[in-house]
Amino acid sequence: MNKFKNIAVYGGGSFGTSLAALAAQNCSNVTLFLRDEEIAKEILHKKTNIKYLGGIKLPAHLHATTNLSVIKDFELIIIAVPSYAFDDSIKLLKTHGISEDNTLLIATKGFARNPTELFSDRLKTLLPHSSTAFFAGPNLAKELAKNLPASASIASLDIDIANKIANNISSKIFTTNMTSDIVTLQVAGALKNIFAIKSGIDLASEQGENARATLIVDALKEIITLSKVFGGLQKNSDILLEAGVVGDLVLTCYALGSRNTNFGYELGISSDKKKFLQEYKQLVEGREALKLVLDLIKQYDLHMPIISEVASYVMPA
């Protein structure tokens, strides 16, 4: 079976740490690269990341370090940083020697900025000729870290790369599907967080479960609309039914463990929404992506009513 011999994960937050734990289930040489020296020592010696994952025990052989000088030696590098940090992260890794010899798996959701584009397209500028794939699925970080059942989609224009990555992370309890439609998977990964805000708002206003289910249907239509702008869904629409699109969408919209759904719910029940928005300091990827998507709607004259409605709550005039 064709596999990567070693795997690096860049990003020591909840999702990055859980992806490192997932990778370590099938690979004996996995290293988590992060900035916080104290958390790195904690993972090394106690096999926990209390700040982000509570007391969940991580695999015994998982390594952690802040020393980026060795990251270039890893065949597969998983990028798990917030969307706003993507460009700076790739530029930093380039100064430490990563090149087209490394395969990059993007686990960051959202859009690259200035200009607004897909992360896979930004990588063509920042790191030309690199092998690139994208990861998405219904994956709450704490459940991944506990090695509970889950699934994901892996997309790459080179389907052999997607298959090779799948060989490293698939198991009886973590299933994967592969696709060459890297566009649709990225668009869905960015938009689902905005739709989750709407789901939380609907929950707060007691719209009922029928409305929340209808939201999923309408959200898929808007994913299709924007995906086609970027050249997605050229061959068929099968990817819409996979873990990385409808699976991730349903989880993000229905789980109060989702930061975006919880943000929408708290906004919905707030008596002073303007004050709430001003004082809310936690990172909400849907909020970050919203302005970028609104610019795309204007640029391409798109009809995406859910996005527009969320904007009326989150970015009131």
Curated annotation (Swiss-Prot):
* Residues the entry annotates as binding NADPH: S14, F15, R35, K109, A141, R259, L283, E285
Q: What class of enzyme is it?
A: oxidoreductase
Q: Looking at the record's lineage, which domain of life comes first?
A: Bacteria
Among its keywords, does the record have Ribosomal protein?
Answer: no
Any Gene Ontology CC annotation = cytosol
Provide the catalytic activity annotation. Answer: sn-glycerol 3-phosphate + NAD(+) = dihydroxyacetone phosphate + NADH + H(+); sn-glycerol 3-phosphate + NADP(+) = dihydroxyacetone phosphate + NADPH + H(+)
The residues that the entry says bind sn-glycerol 3-phosphate are: K109, G137, K192, D248, S258, R259, N260
Quote any Pfam family the record assigns.
NAD_Gly3P_dh_C
| GO molecular function term, any single one | NAD binding
Which HAMAP family does the record match to this protein? NAD_Glyc3P_dehydrog
What name is this protein filed under? Glycerol-3-phosphate dehydrogenase [NAD(P)+]
Its source organism is Rickettsia akari (strain Hartford)
